[in-house]
């Protein structure tokens, strides 16, 4: 599959890249998981809407927010069920024993139903299959032609400061007002602010009420800080 080959090539280029390029590669991988791939497992079709990159390379990318599980190494295109923390499912993209790399499926559509990180494993296990059954599957990434507008932000609920300011989340902007993304609102504030400032620059006579309506249209909610942003 050409798209899996594209992912593989990006992963292979990651290790020797400079930091800024590493972040860009992780963003590109996230973008491709959302727009170019769907996941097919035991009759469940998963469409990623919000994915977060977790990578650990001791020398080149020591992110201690990564679980550093053996299941995050050299299992390209396979699932990893979290062994600790909140619970969740990742897609491993590491193609080497030298480093961990996986993408948390933070928000998805599973057979058309919106699921958050902790809901997805419950739905998968309701099929009667075990975690091991899912983790043994190969070739689960299939071509998709989604046309989402992709944006980036920081990762949600990190427990360590490593790379906490890095925009290692890819998300489908057009999905935000359609589904319940309340878990992400803190991380989305900077995206809302940047969007609103650009909107006000393009519409210099807009009122606060118009700005609030635009925020609600695009992001599905209006942060408390909108009034401050508008009047400053």
Predicted regions and their residues:
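A cross-family signal for N-terminal binding/gating loops and helix N-caps
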Residues: 1-232
């Amino acid at each position: 599959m050409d798209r899996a080959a594209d992912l593989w090539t990006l992963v292979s280029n990651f290790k020797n890249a400079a930091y800024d390029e590493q972040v860009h590669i992780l963003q590109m991988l996230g973008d491709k998981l959302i727009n170019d791939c769907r996941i097919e497992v035991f009759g469940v079709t998963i469409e990623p809407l919000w994915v977060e990159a977790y990578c650990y390379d001791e020398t080149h990318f020591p992110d201690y927010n990564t679980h550093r599980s053996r299941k995050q190494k050299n299992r390209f295109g396979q699932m990893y069920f979290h062994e600790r923390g909140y619970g969740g499912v990742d897609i491993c993209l590491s193609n080497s024993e030298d480093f961990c790399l996986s993408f948390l499926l933070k928000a998805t559509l599973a057979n058309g139903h919106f699921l958050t990180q902790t809901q997805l494993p419950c739905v998968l296990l309701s099929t009667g299959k075990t975690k091991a059954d899912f983790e043994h599957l190969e070739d689960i990434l299939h071509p998709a032609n989604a046309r989402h507008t992709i944006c980036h932000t920081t990762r949600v609920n990190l427990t360590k400061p490593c790379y906490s300011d890095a925009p290692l989340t890819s998300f489908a902007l057009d999905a935000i007002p359609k589904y319940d993304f309340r878990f992400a609102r803190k991380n989305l504030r900077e995206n809302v602010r940047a969007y609103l400032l650009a909107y006000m620059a393009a519409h210099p006579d807009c009122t606060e009420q118009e700005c609030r309506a635009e925020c609600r249209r695009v992001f599905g909610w209006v942060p408390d800080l909108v009034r401050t942003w508008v009047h400053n």
